[in-house]
């Protein structure tokens, strides 16, 4: 068995039977089909920043390391073609260095570029879908490659077609980004609201976002974590109003179809769970939405902690929290909600 500790940002001591690296679509296809021919479970892994190994993986893990950034310029926009294995934050830095703007709000989000569309990553007023032009997908059974337009990706809050139709037997091999030259700053969240829209620079937004994230979120290289563990819940206007009546300071954001988005971190914090610990896993003291590997945590420790948090939030607010992190069992991905219910 081979250790996966350095390939998951939680830093959990999980193991796999085999570990392979794919540096091209062709090698990814060959490695996947080889494992399947041997009747082994297969797990495709990027940066390992959004996964929780609940136990050892009884099969082959393939690391997607398809690299490369190509850029094309038109009169109005920049078009970037990015290999799925490229580190997301390094991509943001690359674009900024080359005076290609629009990704600054998404700085310091961990993981690889190929994972960005799966979750439709987002932060500080921007989501991946806002900068996406297309996503290239490889059918691992047939070898066929398909390019999906942004509309075909069916992006929603922390959701996409890659969690559904293109989840099994498919892999993202590259993404296409469209960044307009007529750059407009997005300053709706956090300390960004203090910046002047008239003279703010992309570098200032980048610096501010990095400062906010490092002040709240632990560095996975030092303290194991997977970033935001839970999704911000979407609730009806009736539920939101009831919470607002009892807790006037509760953060609420208008969402689509008359729904409201609540702040999961605030809900957890109001349950007095900062610092709460089960085994080696605990709730981060500065950001309640982050669960950390405090001391040799196991996947079971994290699952039990997440389940306890979910029960407390239901009891106090009547709101169900769903994990944003993918749960990996012995044969592959398992239902995270079911696991903590």
From Swiss-Prot:
Its job: Cell wall formation.
One biological process term in Gene Ontology: cell division
Assigned protein family: Belongs to the MurB family.
Lineage: superkingdom: Bacteria
Cofactors: FAD
Catalytic activities: UDP-N-acetyl-alpha-D-muramate + NADP(+) = UDP-N-acetyl-3-O-(1-carboxyvinyl)-alpha-D-glucosamine + NADPH + H(+)
Pathway named in the protein's UniProt entry: Cell wall biogenesis; peptidoglycan biosynthesis
Lineage of producing organism: Bacteria, Pseudomonadati, Pseudomonadota, Gammaproteobacteria, Enterobacterales
Active site positions: 158, 228, 324
Residue ranges of domain FAD-binding PCMH-type in the record: 12-182
InterPro entries: FAD-bd_PCMH, FAD-bd_PCMH-like_sf, FAD-bd_PCMH_sub1, FAD-bd_PCMH_sub2, MurB, MurB_C, MurB_C_sf, Oxid_FAD_bind_N
Swiss-Prot/TrEMBL keywords: Cell cycle, Cell division, Cell shape, Cell wall biogenesis/degradation, Cytoplasm, FAD, Flavoprotein, NADP, Oxidoreductase, Peptidoglycan synthesis
Top EC class for this record: oxidoreductase
Compartmental location: Cytoplasm
EC code: 1.3.1.98
Protein name: UDP-N-acetylenolpyruvoylglucosamine reductase
A GO CC term attached to the entry: cytosol
Predominant localisation class: cytoplasm
Molecular functions per Gene Ontology: FAD binding; UDP-N-acetylmuramate dehydrogenase activity
